[in-house]
């Protein structure tokens, strides 16, 4: 999820999610569960944008101080969001695997509290996904023809969903004027 989505509040999500739809995006990744606003999920439902929703783990091989509190929060998140049609994937960890016992718990939580009909993926960039990077803008054709700079080697049919990249972010107009 790009920085400009993280700065939204309330009705601003409607326009920004609509722009994603108009750009033919079909999924937004809620990186590490950064956005919690109901308006975000409502806008995604409205415009038919799927959400890849991460839990709050970030490629760090440490457990939260209280794994039981973490799990209770995960259950509450699932219950709160499960009725949104936009939720497509629940993801356990950004660029890593949730350490025991969390991975097992999160997978069970998704099955029990979300009816078991949505995907749970433990790691955001492995197990069949296209992987990390590149962390730069690329020629638009590359997103459908080749993986630049060795990222996603052996991809012959384009990238599909790249979990580690997003829409390009442009600075504010005021900052751009100062730069020029």
List where the protein language model places each region.
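An acidic-aromatic substrate-binding cleft motif
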Residues: 1-27, 31-36
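Substrate-binding/catalytic cleft of secreted carbohydrate-active enzymes
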Residues: 27-180
